[in-house]
């Protein structure tokens, strides 16, 4: 597993503007019916990562205007709650995601946006302006690297108990991490997170 220094990894130097996959209308990548965009490229290389195929920034296909139109059309369905970004590392693909999130906020402001990241919230607060801008425009962040030694299959939307589901807007307003108020881990899982 790699641990970056603040502002060491820059999207403009790493991202190739590519994605691994786009999956519309799923129920596993966050709350409600969601569309999921898997971006290419990750520098964290977590041991036991279930998505090793996304590590290369050259993997997959180019992100295109046509794909963006499809994402917007799929997101416009009234039963779709929002869009989820996974990878790969979304925050190393700000060149793709910043224009997309700004368009969503303008055209479909009622939709929510979830993102997974290997960065912790505390690391993100020390990151580059593009990453902080992207963070400021999303609703939910699942933070932290996957840690195989803390694996827990009972966790909601996470693989290891060091990862948190963070309400981004409440956290930014309060200046401290605010956990998503719909967190529904089992009692045993909660006690494990609390101990750490």
Model regions and ranges:
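Cysteine-centered iron-sulfur cluster-binding motifs in ferredoxin-type domains/subunits
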Residues: 34-49, 89
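Receiver (REC) domain switch/active-site residues of two-component response regulators
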Residues: 139
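P-loop/Walker A phosphate-binding loop and immediately adjacent motor/lid segment at beta-alpha junctions
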Residues: 93-108, 151-196
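N-terminal [4Fe-4S]-dependent radical SAM core
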Residues: 1-38, 51-57, 177, 184-193
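Conserved Radical SAM active-site core
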Residues: 14-20, 33, 51-115, 119-134
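Flexible, glycine-rich phosphate/dinucleotide-binding loops
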Residues: 28, 122, 150, 174
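Short secondary-structure boundary segments
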Residues: 117-118, 144-146
